[in-house]
A protein has these predicted regions:
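Hydrophobic positions on the alpha1 helix immediately C-terminal to the Walker A/P-loop
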Residues: 194
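Conserved glycine(s) of the Walker
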Residues: 189-191
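A noncatalytic interaction/capping subdomain that flanks phosphate/NTP-handling catalytic cores
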Residues: 2-187, 197-207, 212-354
């Protein structure tokens, strides 16, 4: 998924107008539905306008739900409606709408808030200047592209995490409570295959396949954001342990979406210390093998897609990711035809680094 930030096509939204739009939608849907989460050590309250939006977008956070009633660091207001907020220009025609990524975006950053409209998926994300309030609008919660279900509110969370000293990155992560690996690479490199293959081994826990957050002052620590995963339909046969659990998309060009916390109870994890950076690479080998990689290769696999997809301040984000790859050893995971050999290689690596 790539993005090109441009000037806003319409007048900017206002927090008051967004609040009013949410309240109207909530009343029409029978009232708000609240979801309380613990995200990267912070309390987050998500207010959905009705059960339809909550059911559609809340499943990706099932492993982060908490019964604690702490004051939220961030409150998100999530609704769908025919009425369009300011700044959300009309969606392009079907011929112009990308089917395999989020396409270009319109970004707006002012003293009072920042906003991002993605015409391809037709969603609007707005965050207040203090990072305490966010708004996420969509025209229909039941008709979003697959990537919005697998990684809801990713830009809002990225902006908020930045203020807390965490960096959301384009990568997956698997490991144990004692330590794990960040899995990085461009689309098609095997990140999801590697992360989902870990479910074959009871020793490993799943923290994400596409977006996670990295923080930690004394040692790098990965925070899970989503328990959802995406699988190309053409790859399902290589991961037969997932077939019964896949929530299939309704278009032939979609990836299938899997909710790990539901399909594999106890296998999702909120986070762990980072021990290594792993770069999957598709090869013609039969079995998987791990070999050393350079810090430069790790940065090249991590930074470009993170910056293009999540819109962080590029210079600062690049510096922080460069610091991260200098801190950790990096390895290439040569993927073979036998996917079931992947988790054993990861376990051996983590045991060696422990």
């Amino acid at each position: 998924m790539t993005h090109a930030a441009t000037a806003p096509p319409e007048p900017a939204p206002t927090p008051a107008g967004l609040d009013a739009g949410f309240e109207r939608a909530a009343r029409a849907a029978g009232g708000p539905v609240d979801l309380r989460l613990a995200v990267a050590g912070s309390a987050v309250r998500v207010r959905f306008a009705g059960t339809t939006a909550a059911d559609a977008l809340g499943r990706a956070f099932a492993h982060l739900v908490t019964a604690r009633d702490d004051a939220p660091a961030l409150t998100l207001h999530v609704w769908d409606s025919v009425e369009r907020p300011a700044f959300a220009a009309g969606r392009p025609s079907e011929a112009e709408t990308p089917t395999t990524g989020a396409g270009p975006s319109y970004f707006y950053d002012e003293l009072e808030f920042r906003a991002l409209h993605q015409p391809a998926s037709d969603v609007l994300s707005v965050l207040s200047a203090d990072g305490a309030a966010g708004w996420f609008w969509m025209p229909d919660a039941t008709r979003l592209p697959y990537w919005e279900y697998s990684a809801p509110f990713r830009h809002l969370l990225s902006w908020c995490l930045d203020a807390q000293g965490c960096r959301q990155v384009h990568g997956g992560a698997v490991g144990t409570k004692d330590g794990g690996a960040l899995i990085v690479g461009p689309g098609g490199s095997g990140k999801s295959t590697t992360a989902l293959a870990s479910l074959l081994d009871e020793r490993l826990r799943y923290a994400g396949d596409d977006y996670v957050a990295v923080g930690g002052e004394r040692e790098p620590f990965v925070h899970s954001l989503y328990c959802a995963a995406k699988v190309h339909h053409d790859d399902v046969h290589r991961l037969p342990h997932l077939e019964a659990a896949l929530a299939d998309g309704d278009r032939a060009d979609e990836k299938a979406v899997l909710y790990v916390a539901t399909a594999f109870p106890g296998r999702s994890i909120a986070g762990f210390p980072l021990r290594a950076i792993v770069l999957p690479r598709v090869t013609d080998r039969r079995t998987a093998r791990i070999v050393p990689a350079s810090h430069a290769a790790a940065l090249a696999a991590l930074a470009p897609s993170t910056i293009f997809q999540l819109h962080p301040p590029a210079r600062e984000a690049l510096a922080r990711m460069a610091d991260l790859v200098r801190t950790l050893p990096s390895f290439v995971l040569e993927l073979g035809a036998d996917v079931e050999t992947i988790p054993a290689e990861l376990v051996r690596l983590l045991e060696r680094l422990d």
